[in-house]
Amino acid sequence: MSFKVQIRRAAEVDIAEAQLWYEAQRSGLGAEFHSEVSRVIHRLAETPLIYQMVHRDVRRAVVHRFPYLLWYRVQGEDVTVLACTYAGRDPSKVMSRLR
């Protein structure tokens, strides 16, 4: 069964900003970051329940090779990506964005 993944506008902005930052560090690194995020999103469409639930109905998935997390919610057959944040960010500040 494949889940429908929707990405909130705020999460799209998070991803784009991180991608630009990585690209400024080294040419091509931004594309590598985007590719890793896309892999996680693909996994969410296939098996969203494998990732840890961290707050009420919110789960988080790790972006491999990069210190970023995708925060998301599963409701029925829908997955909504709420945010993409730096893994070292204070979790309490992240939680305020997930409502």
Over which residues does each language-model region extend?
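Structural signal for well-ordered, non-membrane alpha-helices
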Residues: 19, 23, 38-45
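Basic/aromatic recognition patch in beta-strand/loop cores that engages polyanionic ligands
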Residues: 39, 46-78
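Enriched for short, Lys/Arg-rich terminal
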Residues: 1, 69, 73-99
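Short, hydrophobic secondary-structure boundary micro-motifs
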Residues: 31, 52-54, 93
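Arg/Lys-rich, positively charged N-terminal/basic patches that mediate binding to nucleic acids
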Residues: 1-34
